[in-house]
C-alpha cells in the first residue's frame, strides 16, 4: 500500500508541475 501511495503522490506532483501551479 505504501508503494501505491508514493506512486499516487508522484503522479499528483507531476500533474501539478505540468499545469505549472
From Swiss-Prot:
Superkingdom field: Viruses
Protein keywords: Capsid protein, Late protein, T=13 icosahedral capsid protein, Virion
Gene Ontology cellular-component terms listed: T=13 icosahedral viral capsid
PTMs per UniProt: Proteolytic cleavage give rise to gp24*.
Compositional bias of kind Polar residues: 10-21
Keyword Secreted listed: no
Ribosomal protein is among the record's keywords: no
Stretches for region Disordered: 1-21
Assembly mode: Homopentamer. A total of 55 subunits of gp24 forms the 11 pentamers. Interacts with portal protein gp20. Interacts with gp23 that forms 160 hexamers.
Family, per entry: Belongs to the T4 phage capsid protein family.
Function: Capsid protein that self-associates to form 11 pentons, building the T=13 laevo capsid in association with 160 hexamers of gp23* and one dodecamer of gp20.
Listed name of the protein: Capsid vertex protein gp24
Organism: Enterobacteria phage T6 (Bacteriophage T6)
Gene name tied to this protein: gp24
Amino acid at each position: 500500500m505504501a508503494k501505491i501511495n508514493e506512486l499516487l503522490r508522484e503522479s499528483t506532483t507531476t500533474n501539478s508541475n505540468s499545469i505549472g501551479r
